[in-house]
Amino acid sequence: MKKIVIVAFLFAFTAVPAVAAEGKNNVGVSYGLDLDGVLGVQGEFDISASMPNKAPVSIQVFWKNYSQTYPTGAGTYQWSYNGFGAAAIYDFSSSFKLDSRIKPYAGLGLIALNSTLSGPAGQPPTSADSGGLYIVGGVRYAMTPAVSADLNLNNYGGLTIGALFNF
């Protein structure tokens, strides 16, 4: 699983920017409202020019982190998840008659997760790796030509709000 995600990242950071449409790319930050907060950063590159029939597709590469502290009588435990992934995002704005600033979308990709549990001093931390499908659907609202608000539902972070900076 790690090899697939590494290949996806290499593809996204080398090949995708070469075919990305200027002015339709973005970087952003997000905050998942589930699990007491999931922080994330992402980059998204429009590849519609290289798609058959110019389909409105972009590639999203992201990192998300969730961390929680649990105090106990024996000490404090900290649990954290790091998720790295890539997804193909389809823009449905041309399929619906909406305000041009509203952009509904859905996406599917892969995510690799690393979880770590550390305990009181003297106990070694434990960690595990996993991964799987990443599913996302949401809507973006262009507040200005350079900034968009994002609201989505995904399977890592749940209901998520964010800000995207277009370039």
Could you describe each region identified by the protein language model?
Residues F92-P120, P125-S130:
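Mid-chain, well-packed structural core segment of small domains
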Residues I135-G137, Y141, P145:
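Catalytic phosphate/metal-binding cores of nucleic-acid and nucleotide-processing enzymes, i.e., regions
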Residues I111-S115, G138, N152:
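Mature soluble domains of exported/periplasmic/lumenal proteins and thiol-rich metal-chelating peptides
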Residues M1-K24:
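Cleavable N-terminal export/targeting peptides
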Residues G157-F167:
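Outer-membrane beta-barrel "beta-signal"
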Residues E22-S95, S148-D150, N154, T160:
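Glycine- and aromatic-enriched membrane insertion/assembly motifs of diderm outer-membrane
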